[in-house]
């Protein structure tokens, strides 16, 4: 498949069509992604052997889209964020990776202001949130607190871990050591 076909396949699976970039469209994409694409670790196990041989632990975008659209799979935060980044980029969004310590990949989308987008945290995050504004969301399982204080962003899941979000955009190549280490089990 070519890029246009891959984008259309991804959008069709999400139940939408291409629109001009906007916060409304971004939120529509996030909600559909969260509802339709699974967070799972089976694909990490599947991709590990190839990754140990090649150093590339992530599937091609064509493989990723095929897995979500025909096999009901998704991935971890890394795979889901990479796939969503690819989609948003191809739709014209200004999107970057961000790292959350320890061990989490999420996205920054710049529109009228920068937004925090996280489709790989298995949290009740069904929309984009202004990157530098605190917020809290809850569901029957947990409370997710995003606290901005003195240029530092602390994210707490209750129950669950506390992490620190680094808002500077990163490149996946700078995360190679961390990615390799996360597959050393």
List where the protein language model places each region.
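His-Asp-centered catalytic microenvironments across diverse enzyme cores
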Residues: 2-5, 9, 103-185
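Active-site neighborhood of thiol-dependent amide/isopeptide-bond enzymes
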Residues: 45, 49-110
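Solvent-exposed, charged interface segments at domain starts and junctions
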Residues: 18-43, 79-100, 117-141
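Secondary-structure boundary elements
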Residues: 1-72
């Amino acid at each position: 498949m070519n890029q246009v076909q891959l984008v259309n396949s991804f959008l069709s699976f999400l139940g939408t069509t291409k629109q001009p970039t906007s916060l409304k469209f971004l939120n529509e994409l996030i909600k559909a992604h969260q509802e339709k694409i699974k967070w799972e670790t089976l694909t990490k196990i599947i991709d590990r052997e190839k990754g140990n041989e090649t150093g590339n632990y992530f599937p091609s975008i064509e493989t990723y889209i095929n897995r979500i659209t025909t096999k009901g799979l998704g991935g971890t935060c890394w795979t889901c964020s990479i796939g969503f980044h690819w989609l948003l980029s191809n739709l014209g969004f200004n999107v970057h990776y961000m790292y959350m310590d320890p061990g989490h990949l999420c996205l920054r989308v710049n529109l009228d202001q920068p937004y925090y987008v996280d489709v790989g945290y298995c949290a009740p995050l069904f929309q984009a949130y202004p990157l530098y504004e605190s917020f809290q969301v809850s569901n029957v399982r947990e409370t997710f607190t995003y606290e901005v204080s003195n240029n530092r962003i602390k994210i707490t899941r209750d129950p669950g871990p506390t992490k620190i979000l680094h808002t500077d955009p990163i490149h996946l190549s700078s995360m190679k050591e961390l990615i390799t280490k996360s597959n050393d089990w």
